[in-house]
Amino acid sequence: MLPSVISYDKRGVIPVIVSRMMRILLATILLVLLTTASAASERLPLFQDESIIKAVLTAPIAQAYAQRDQDVRLYMPGQWVYADADGENHRLDVSIRTRGLFRREYCDLSPLQLNFKKKQVKDTLFDGQNKLKVVAPCKHGAQWQQKVVLEYLAYRTLQILTDTSFSTRLVRLSYVDSDESMEPWTDLVFVIEDDDDMADRLGLVKLGVVANQFNQLDRPATALAELFQLLIANNDYSVLQGPEGDECCHNSEILAPKGNADSRIPVPFDFDLSGLVNAKYAAPPSSIPIRFVRTRYYRGLCHPPGVLEDAMAQVQSKRAEIMALYASTPLLEPRTKASTYRYIEEFFELLDDPKRVQKEIVGRCRGEDELAEMLSRD
């Protein structure tokens, strides 16, 4: 007879016997995935450093913004000049167009996508780059600038938790409209690693699927992603499906090991509607019983016994590093920095309290019946 440990179902009252062998097997699978990822390849040069790049974008920016309401938007040709670590300027051709969904239509300064020429960027800081998403302030003003910093810190938090995350790089970007229809301005923005590049770096493949079935998800990776979403109080995501008519999944890129499409790994992105960022336009989904976006509400799936506990232990193991990220950043104004630090601290206080974990995390998991069916087939 195999030795066993006792854990509990979501109500905390029914004992569930879980073999240690199963937990060891799950941990071994996760270790293999992480080892494969770490051995896959290095990050491209742009994402090997955390220093802020200084750059100037000269392009018909006003024309690009004028297309924001169009489904088909043309790339506008321009120039990208950046300074390297030695202060030497480098000029690259670039094309731009607006991107995104909500922010593209709502924001005065719609997000841009950069399109570089692969041959031209060879042997530069942008070597290997083709298309890059830019996350920038929604509107002019210091308050909107702080929102960009907070979203950048959300990405950095996920990078601390797992390599299975999008790389980012800050840019002090000056915008110059080549038609002189807009006055020049400068903002702190960040660029995000291309999804195909991320998959290649991790030695995984990107899946273009309509939806994920409950039993197709990599449980440890999914549980970790869902705890991260709780940490930043983000409910604007799904690991099961995308918006109607779109590929899976909403604000989650789906990756899988080569040859194993039934071990799907969700990679979160797009955090402007999170409580951490707390943008003026953010509001909780009407489907969950909270009024304020800053209120944390767990929307994760139910997982086999031990999976969520292991994910919480992994998050706790990164606690000091995460808190140091928010304590040491020079990019936040003092009041915002203090309130943000406290907000992150409150998440770890939740994890420290077993009764709250049972009530606010385990007790709110979704798909209990689907989990029972999945376990009955194993």
Predicted feature descriptions by range:
Residues 6-7, 35-39:
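Intrinsic disorder/low-complexity segments in short proteins, especially the signal peptide
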Residues 21, 30, 196:
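Short, flexible active-site-adjacent loop segments at beta-strand->alpha-helix junctions, enriched
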Residues 5, 9, 13-18:
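Acidic, Ala/Val/Gly-enriched low-complexity intrinsically disordered segments
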Residues 40-378:
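Phosphate/dinucleotide-binding and metal-coordinating scaffold of catalytic cores
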Residues 18-24:
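Positively charged n-region of N-terminal signal peptides that target proteins for export
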Residues 25-35:
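Bacterial N-terminal signal peptides
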